[in-house]
C-alpha cells in the first residue's frame, strides 16, 4: 500500500465546507470571535464571502463547533507544531562497548574515548567484560577493570548497575549520563 506525503496520513481529518452535515453550527468567525449559533447555510455563505473555508473543529459538541479559517494554513501550522514536538524529543539509546580482562592500554583508551562520546551525546552505555577459558578463574581482574572505567568516567556518568557476580561468562555494568545543569 502506497501512501502520500509522510506525516499527513496520521493527521486527524476535519470536515470542511460541504462535508459538514449538521443543520446548525456554533460559529467562530475569522477573528476568533464567537458568532453564536447559525444555520449551516449562513455560516457557509459567510465563509465564502471571506474567501476561506468553514472548518468543523469539534464535531461531537451539540451543535458542532465550526470556524471560518484558511484550512490549508491551519493544516500547515498543525504539521509544523508536530514537527517541533518531535524535534524536542530525544530518543535515548543504549550503546555497548565490550572489554576483555586482558584489554591492552591502547585499546582501553580508544574504547574509553568512544564511551565518552556516547555519554556526551546523552546515550546510556553498557560495558560488557567477556571472559574466555581460564580467565573465569580471575574475575577480580574484571572487577578492577570496571572500577577503573567507573573512575575514569565519574565526571560524565553515574553507574546504574554494577555487577556483583559473573552472569554466564560476562560481567555487565550500565552507566547513564549525568544530568546537565
Swiss-Prot record:
Pfam family, one: IF3_C
Location(s) in or outside the cell: Cytoplasm
Stored Gene3D superfamilies: Translation initiation factor 3 (IF-3), C-terminal domain, Translation initiation factor 3 (IF-3), N-terminal domain
InterPro entries from the UniProt entry: T_IF-3_C_sf, T_IF-3_N_sf, Translation_initiation_fac3_CS, Translation_initiation_fac_3, Translation_initiation_fac_3_C, Translation_initiation_fac_3_N
SUPFAM superfamilies cross-referenced by the UniProt entry: Translation initiation factor IF3, C-terminal domain, Translation initiation factor IF3, N-terminal domain
Any one Gene Ontology cellular component term annotated for this protein: cytosol
Keywords, comma-separated and alphabetical: Cytoplasm, Initiation factor, Protein biosynthesis
GO biological process, one term: ribosome disassembly
GO molecular function terms noted in the UniProt entry: ribosome binding; translation initiation factor activity
Protein family according to the UniProt entry: Belongs to the IF-3 family.
Assembly, per entry: Monomer.
PANTHER family: TRANSLATION INITIATION FACTOR IF-3, TRANSLATION INITIATION FACTOR IF-3, MITOCHONDRIAL
Function according to Swiss-Prot or TrEMBL: IF-3 binds to the 30S ribosomal subunit and shifts the equilibrium between 70S ribosomes and their 50S and 30S subunits in favor of the free subunits, thus enhancing the availability of 30S subunits on which protein synthesis initiation begins.
Protein name listed in UniProt: Translation initiation factor IF-3
Amino acid at each position: 500500500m502506497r501512501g502520500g506525503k509522510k506525516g499527513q496520513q496520521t493527521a486527524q481529518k476535519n470536515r470542511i465546507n460541504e462535508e459538514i452535515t449538521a443543520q446548525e453550527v456554533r460559529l467562530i468567525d475569522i477573528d476568533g470571535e464567537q458568532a453564536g449559533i447559525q444555520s449551516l447555510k449562513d455560516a457557509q455563505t459567510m465563509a465564502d464571502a471571506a474567501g476561506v473555508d468553514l472548518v468543523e473543529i469539534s464535531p461531537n459538541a451539540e451543535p458542532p463547533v465550526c470556524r471560518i479559517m484558511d484550512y490549508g494554513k491551519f493544516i500547515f501550522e498543525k504539521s509544523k507544531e508536530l514537527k517541533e514536538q518531535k524535534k524536542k524529543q530525544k530518543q535515548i539509546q543504549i550503546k555497548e562497548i565490550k572489554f576483555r580482562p586482558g584489554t591492552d592500554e591502547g585499546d582501553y583508551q580508544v574504547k574509553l574515548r568512544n564511551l565518552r562520546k556516547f555519554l556526551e551525546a546523552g546515550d546510556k552505555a553498557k560495558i560488557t567484560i567477556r571472559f574466555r577459558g581460564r580467565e573465569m578463574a580471575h574475575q577480580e581482574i574484571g572487577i578492577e577493570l570496571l572500577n577503573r572505567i567507573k573512575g575514569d568516567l565519574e565526571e560524565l556518568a553515574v553507574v546504574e548497575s554494577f555487577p556483583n557476580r559473573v552472569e554466564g561468562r560476562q560481567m555487565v555494568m550500565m552507566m547513564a549520563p549525568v544530568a546537565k545543569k
